[in-house]
From Swiss-Prot:
ATP binds at S53, V54, G55, G56, N57, G58, K59, T60. One of its GO terms (biological process) is lipid A biosynthetic process. It comes from Haemophilus influenzae (strain PittEE). The lineage of its organism: Bacteria, Pseudomonadati, Pseudomonadota, Gammaproteobacteria, Pasteurellales. This is Tetraacyldisaccharide 4'-kinase. InterPro entries: LpxK, P-loop_NTPase. Pathway: Glycolipid biosynthesis; lipid IV(A) biosynthesis; lipid IV(A) from (3R)-3-hydroxytetradecanoyl-[acyl-carrier-protein] and UDP-N-acetyl-alpha-D-glucosamine: step 6/6. Transfers the gamma-phosphate of ATP to the 4'-position of a tetraacyldisaccharide 1-phosphate intermediate (termed DS-1-P) to form tetraacyldisaccharide 1,4'-bis-phosphate (lipid IVA). One of its GO terms (cellular component) is plasma membrane.
């Protein structure tokens, strides 16, 4: 919502509801901390990758990066997710790159495709972990989202934040974009800011595009070969994708933003770009592959994550925590 990042009067009109939201969430958190409500401890270490605010912060590229880095260290990694946008009739569901996005959710299918890691979705994270461990050998589990899902105990927490929008107006829902108060950042292990650094950054992520891939033929083409086109995006922050393409020198004749996790129909997109290249995100592409046209291209990005400050050693410290954590579980 635009007013989340402004001084709109709507903020004060909605602030009583935000107070109620905060009280309920605080009570719920306290009940888990005191053991009044039960929580689940997985038999393997769990890393949460989540957000403090709603909207597109860049969580999925961080999950992909984390899984790939853990695998480089010789660890067998499994991924669980709520599977937002999934319409599966049964849960938990084992997701592969061939799972229909309407069943598996666009982000879990993308993660499975990019990492080749076992992925299981379910609103019940315990059931997701139990199915995951029954069908795959895992040394460590990455939870895609779930920072506020206190029913699942965790060993490390990573928060991903948009560097520019940060925490918005600082209010919790619905007056602001936050799911919890900014003070929650004091208890997480690592903060990655997307697109630059701010006062909260432990590390900074830049999303790096290398080429465009044709949805129908899988042809790869350098982005500099394109002069113009049309772009669509059904992600949390569509403008970030459009701006990226323009910075690469592509003149966008038209842009069309859709809601996050949009379910696309061929007719929606065909009329947008009949004779021009149509660019979309990789997340959108997994939902459009089955009815793709010759002029449709997606632009995959890789997460490049660096220290927030040159003299810092936040990343080595973070990996040291993970090494220690895995060793503790292996030694019982």
């Amino acid at each position: 919502m635009p007013f989340w990042y402004s001084n709109s009067k709507l903020i004060w009109l909605l602030s009583p509801f935000s107070l109620l939201f905060w009280l309920i969430s605080q009570l719920r958190h306290a009940l888990f901390c005191l053991g009044i409500k039960s929580s689940y401890r997985a038999p393997k270490p769990v890393i949460i990758v989540g957000n403090l605010s709603v909207g597109g912060n860049g969580k999925t590229p961080v999950v992909v990066w984390l899984v790939e880095e853990l695998k480089k260290r010789g660890l067998r990694v499994g991924v669980i997710s709520r599977g937002y946008g999934s319409k599966s009739k049964t849960y938990p569901l084992f997701v592969t790159e061939n799972t229909r996005p309407i069943e598996g959710g666009d982000e879990p299918v993308l993660i499975a495709k990019r990492t080749n890691a076992p992925v299981v979705i379910s609103p019940n994270r315990q059931q997701a972990i139990e199915l995951l461990l029954s069908q795959a050998e895992c040394d460590i589990i990455v939870s895609d989202d779930g920072l506020q899902h206190y029913k699942l105990q965790r060993d490390l927490e990573i928060v991903v934040m948009d560097a520019e929008r940060a925490l918005g107006n600082g209010f919790v829902l619905p007056a602001g974009p936050l799911r919890e108060l900014p003070s929650r950042l004091k208890s997480v292990d690592f903060v990655i800011t997307n697109g630059g650094k701010n006062q909260y950054s432990d590390a900074v992520m830049y999303l790096v595009p290398h080429f465009a891939i044709n949805l129908k033929t899988n042809e790869k083409r350098q982005l500099k070969e394109f002069q113009s086109g049309v772009a669509i995006a059904g992600i949390g922050n569509p403008q970030r994708f459009f701006t990226m393409l323009e910075k690469l020198g592509i003149q966008l004749e038209r842009t069309q933003a859709f809601q996050d996790h949009q379910h696309f129909e061929a007719s929606q997109l065909e009329k947008l770009a009949e004779n021009q290249p149509l660019f979309m995100t990789e997340k959108d592409a997994v939902k459009c592959q089955s009815f793709a046209k010759d002029n449709w291209w997606y632009v995959p990005v890789d997460a490049e994550i660096i220290e927030a400050e040159k003299q810092c050693e936040n990343l080595p410290h973070f990996w040291g925590k993970i090494d220690k954590l895995v060793a503790q579980y292996r030694n019982g």
